């Protein structure tokens, strides 16, 4: 079955979006000429300031696009105030009115909780005790609403039994500690963002190309979760309830009971399935899942939402298993290494197709696009497999139609099974950091938009795209994972380890190719040769 993959170069793949209309006569162009001369339509560039929303600690104002980070002074010099952070009710997402029964909640949920406890009401759920609770439908199922009140930390013992106004005010010290923690977190977030802005120059972040994100707001609505845990947890570490209220990445589902991981796996985190909640977390309670739905959606910047929409895991699965099935149908035995090369080649075409449609990459000329892809293709493939294993439960192997076992882990290692232990250690590190889909797609953009790649012409656009994604990821990690110390920095430190795995895999593939053991005239082999020519 030594049939070659389609003879299509990376330049031809990238130029597909600007190809001539059907019916025109197209002359074949030599590979070297095509790679050096083809380019996309020239686009007029403009400098557009990236509007990172800033909330003034002294007033609590700002927040609309156009409120820029201050250019002078430090955040630490600002005074404390009651309204530094806009709060959202952890039960329904409505505006918080104050501390009620051990937690910051809205007036509606406060009254509902008090009436339920004082009147000793007993509710039933007509559905499956997993009703979605938000501002618009919080009255539909009182059972699930009350359960969610308890889950997020509202205290039964704080409700007065005599039905008089006012609660049992034994939580005062806790409220003060929580306010101090909240202000400290806000300072750390603003200092980190301003430090990043300062490292990029006094001019702030500037987009050097037309972009739909000319007014990206990366301000996040922060609800400090489960303050009642402070009564029983040390000040230096959040309690279990606090950790439970943090956004959790989808947990890998249990391994399939059969050997074959079907292409229609229900664990796919496709854009339709991934709505910034923990739908894939099989250990999550219904109420915690509903809480994530109502609060975490508000924490994610529009740019990261748009990035996540480019992740199509369903298509990734269909392409992978569709190719494995088609290549082994009515075959007694196949060369598994050659099959792996065909899968990698298909993955590369998918990488090119994904990249050329992304907001930053598509404005570059084809020469620059080629150089960026030639530098990053292998590390992005390794990252993709980490993502599939962590978020979609991709198993280590699958059984082909002819009964042979295909090593999916080895596929992610580019054919070097001896790197499996290192790969698993890397996966464990990411799991400890609660590596989720927004993290994954931002890191992937940062791998692609590497301004240090030699030979690129429009370094300015590449660097600005990289810095924009970097700033969005920093803001996301500080906002959604405040309890993970320096999550952003630790993610950045993991990147060289992914590069090391990819480099070992590349070298292995190149050696096999030189020994005549791999298909020729494929995009995979073109990539391997291109990096050695640069």
From Swiss-Prot:
Residues 247-256 have a biased composition (Pro residues). The keyword Ribonucleoprotein does not apply. The keyword ATP-binding does not apply. Keywords: Activator, DNA-binding, Metal-binding, Nucleus, Receptor, Transcription, Transcription regulation, Zinc, Zinc-finger. Residues 86-161 bind DNA. Residues 299-531 form the NR LBD domain. One of its GO terms (molecular function) is RNA polymerase II cis-regulatory region sequence-specific DNA binding. Residues 227-296 are annotated as: Disordered. It holds the Pfam family zf-C4. Present in all tissues examined. Belongs to the nuclear hormone receptor family. NR5 subfamily. This is Nuclear hormone receptor FTZ-F1. The gene is FTZ-F1.
């Amino acid at each position: 079955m030594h049939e070659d993959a389609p003879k299509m170069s990376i330049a031809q793949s990238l130029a597909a979006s600007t190809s001539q209309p059907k019916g025109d006569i197209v002359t074949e162009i030599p590979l070297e000429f095509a790679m050096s001369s083809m380019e996309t339509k020239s686009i007029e560039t403009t400098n557009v300031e990236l509007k990172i929303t800033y909330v003034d600690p002294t007033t609590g104002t700002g927040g609309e696009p156009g409120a820029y980070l201050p250019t002078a002074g430090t955040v630490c010099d600002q005074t404390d105030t009651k309204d530094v952070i806009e709060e959202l009710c952890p039960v329904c997402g409505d505006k918080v009115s104050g501390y009620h029964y051990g937690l910051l909640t809205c007036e509606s949920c406060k009254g509902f909780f008090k009436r339920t406890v004082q009147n000793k009401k007993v509710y039933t759920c007509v559905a499956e005790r997993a009703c979605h609770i938000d501002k618009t439908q919080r009255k539909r199922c009182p059972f699930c609403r009350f359960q969610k009140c308890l889950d997020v930390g509202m205290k039964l013992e704080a409700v007065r039994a005599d039905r008089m106004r006012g609660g049992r005010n034994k939580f005062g010290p806790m409220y003060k500690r929580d306010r101090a923690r909240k202000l400290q977190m806000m300072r750390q977030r603003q200092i980190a963002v301003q430090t990043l802005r300062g490292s990029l120059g006094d001019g702030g972040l500037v987009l050097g190309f037309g972009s739909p994100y000319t007014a990206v707001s990366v301000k996040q609505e922060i609800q400090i979760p489960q303050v009642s845990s402070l009564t029983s947890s040390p000040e230096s570490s959040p309690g279990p309830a606090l950790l439970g209220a943090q956004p959790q990445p989808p947990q890998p589902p249990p391994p399939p009971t059969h050997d074959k991981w079907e292409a229609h796996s229900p664990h796919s985190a496709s854009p339709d399935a991934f709505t910034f909640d923990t739908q894939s977390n099989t250990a999550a309670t219904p109420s915690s899942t509903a809480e994530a739905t109502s609060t975490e959606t508000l924490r994610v910047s529009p740019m990261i939402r748009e990035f996540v929409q480019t992740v199509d895991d369903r298509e990734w699965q269909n392409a992978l298993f569709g190719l494995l099935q088609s290549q082994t149908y009515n075959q007694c035995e196949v060369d598994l290494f050659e099959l792996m090369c065909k899968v990698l080649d298909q993955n590369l075409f998918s990488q090119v197709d994904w990249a050329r449609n992304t907001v930053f990459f598509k404005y570059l000329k084809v020469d620059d696009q080629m150089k960026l892809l030639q530098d990053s293709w292998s590390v992005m493939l390794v990252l993709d497999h980490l993502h599939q294993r962590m978020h979609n439960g991709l198993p280590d192997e699958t059984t082909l139609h002819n009964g042979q076992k295909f090593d999916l882990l080895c596929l992610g290692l580019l054919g070097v099974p001896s790197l499996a232990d290192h790969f698993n250690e890397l996966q464990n590190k990411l799991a400890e950091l609660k590596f989720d889909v927004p993290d994954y797609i931002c890191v992937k953009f940062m791998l692609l938009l590497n301004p240090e790649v030699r030979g690129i012409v429009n370094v300015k656009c590449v660097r600005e795209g990289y810095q924009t994604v970097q700033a969005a990821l920093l803001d996301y990690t500080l906002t959604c994972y405040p309890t993970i110390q320096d999550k952003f920095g630790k993610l950045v430190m993991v990147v060289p380890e992914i590069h090391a795995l990819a480099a070992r895999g590349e070298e292995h593939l190149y050696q096999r190719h030189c020994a005549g053991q791999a298909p020729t005239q494929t995009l995979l082999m073109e990539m391997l040769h291109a990096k050695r020519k640069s």
